[in-house]
């Protein structure tokens, strides 16, 4: 199975900040990298697919980049509603494995 290593595991930032979450695959995944978020109520939503393509309805404050084994998710102009746990997932090979998650909190 392809192992996905996601960093950091937790992140605290202020409203308006820009934050970046990284994900590294144990082998080349040919840009088949998706990003999801899980809200505190358990709701899961796809944000980005195929490295950088925004899912319908996702604001342009979210962006993805990367290639080969190294990928990142950037959230600009952080908003209160962005409080979530974010996960990367590779879709290049079965099983479609996930990173361990990044819990994003807002500094008060």
From Swiss-Prot:
The keyword Disulfide bond belongs to this UniProt entry's keyword annotation: yes
Region named Complementarity-determining-1: 24-34
Pfam families linked to this entry: V-set
SMART domains assigned: IG, IGv
InterPro entries: Ig-like_dom (IPR007110), Ig-like_dom_sf (IPR036179), Ig-like_fold (IPR013783), Ig_sub (IPR003599), Ig_V-set (IPR013106), IgV_Light_Chain (IPR050150)
Region (Framework-3): 57-88
Stretches the record annotates as Complementarity-determining-2: 50-56
Framework-4, as annotated region: 98-108
Annotated GO CC locations: immunoglobulin complex
Gene Ontology biological process terms from the UniProt entry: adaptive immune response; immune response
Region Framework-2, residue ranges: 35-49
PROSITE patterns named among the record's database cross-references: IG_LIKE (PS50835)
UniProt region (Framework-1), positions on chain: 1-23
Note from the entry: Anti-arsonate hybridoma protein.
Name by which UniProt lists this protein: Ig kappa chain V-V region HP 91A3
Gene source species: Mus musculus (Mouse)
